[in-house]
Amino acid sequence: MKIEEIKMIYIDEMIGQEVEMDEFSQMEATEEIAMKIEEKTLDMMEKDLEFMERYPNPTYAVLRLSYLVGSEDMENWKKLQEMYEEKTLLNHLKEIQNQAVDFIKREKVKMMKAQGLTEKMKRENPEEYQGQMNNLMATVKRMAIKEYVEA
């Protein structure tokens, strides 16, 4: 059975249980519902001025939303739909953003120390320092994505 068929069965079950889904009742495809959830959630995120001021580019929140929307895993689909219906999706995404950014800050310091990236190195060999910092940041960001976005 294809994931689309499984998702439609799940949606049919939810409708059968009289779960509030009025806004999706005219939609036929699961993908259409997922895209609508994504669109509405991004709109709500943009309206949260405090959050947007703190994170003008909420990369990890948006990546997490995209991950849940595009996931082939039935558990992720259920999680997305339940959080949306319970109105906890936006808070979940904001928390993912906070956790990922905090993780990056902590790990960056640890990894800089472990790799010997010091102010002295920055002054004496700026090109080497910059290259190593670029690699370090790419690694830390990949770690954050694995730990928080794809968890």
What does each model-found stretch correspond to?
Residues 1-79:
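Oxidative protein folding and maturation machinery
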Residues 54, 70, 86-97, 126-134:
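Conserved phosphate/pyrophosphate-binding and hydrolysis machinery centered on Walker-type P-loop NTPases
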Residues 58, 62-74, 110-151:
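C-terminal charged interaction modules
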Residues 85-122, 139:
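Active-site helix-to-loop segments that bind/position phosphate- or nucleotide-bearing substrates
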